[in-house]
Amino acid sequence: MWPPSRRQLCLAFLLVCALSAFSFLLHLHQDLFRNGLALSLPCLERQPVPAPVAIVCLPVTSPASNASSCAGRPAAPSGIWTIHPDGRFGNQMGQYATLLALAQLNGRRAFILPAMHAALAPVFRITLPVLAPEVNRRTSWKQLLLHDWMSEEYSRLEDPFLKFTGFPCSWTFFHHVREQIRREFTLHDHLREEAQRLLGKLRLGRTGARPRTFVGVHVRRGDYLQVMPQRWKGVVGDRAYLQQAMDWFRARHEAPIFVVTSNGMKWCWENIDASRGDVVFAGNGLESSPAKDFALLTQCNHTVMTIGTFGFWAAYLAGGDTVYLANFTLPDSEFLKIFKPEAAFLPEWVGINADLSPVRTLSGSWRPWRFLG
């Protein structure tokens, strides 16, 4: 019998090694199954999809450093801030904008309550998340009543669970983030397009020409007719004021047209002079559904406002020139304790003084009664 050659010995050695390796893997696989584990091979037909990962940056415990263990990532804001929705459309716009600005200023997360979302979301592309009712009920809130102008104390609020109340609507809260506010209050396309279609059909009555400038006019009436004189010793915009405001635009803009909206349209028809053919009574005046009137005003180039937050926001978002009713209360009005004109109207806006003679007469008739009792 011939002794095995060197080649045969090498092949036999390789066969033994292969059998040993296979036996080792087989035992390893059985052990893994016995301990409740399983090996799986990646599917070659498709790439694995990574699951969402939440990264939490823990603070470094070293006293020599204040940095986060996740370099370059700012710490996530803690706590929850919200605001109690109160009042009508313009009030809630002011509350939304103030909440957003103050939360950012203090590094907190802002949430709105469902009622505010229901009021604003059908009109605007707002982005603040909605706070679940259960979370609202179970949270131990610190409540803070805001006055209607920015104060230094509001820039260093430390409560992590804060619920604002009040009716803030001052540009001093949010004007530094104006472009962000304008994005939040972007109209939905169907509202913007409907308003632009209506404006595009307007013609000047005397010439039939297309107007070159659109001036939105908002005339606030309704409950203010009683509230202003009886509670605040003030007035609303009257016929003379509106005439002055419109003449101001006629003197500065060629071929303007005035698009009037109001919650008192009958009064507007009777008191606004439309004989020049440059006035259109376009609003529906429905306070329960303000979207169409508001969309019309914001799509105009300029604004005439009387008083109220609805007119303020229409002017703020429209941009351009704004004429407003100035000094509409008596100097001793309690209203001036909660309202600062310099914080309510932008410095570049133009004020026309109100005629206070009606409320002076009314105030004079009250004066003798102050000394009784």
UniProtKB/Swiss-Prot annotation:
Its main location: Golgi. Pathway: Protein modification; protein glycosylation. One of its GO terms (biological process) is positive regulation of sprouting angiogenesis. Residues 30-373 are lumenal. One of its GO terms (cellular component) is Golgi cisterna membrane. Belongs to the glycosyltransferase 11 family. This is Galactoside alpha-(1,2)-fucosyltransferase 1. It comes from Oryctolagus cuniculus (Rabbit).
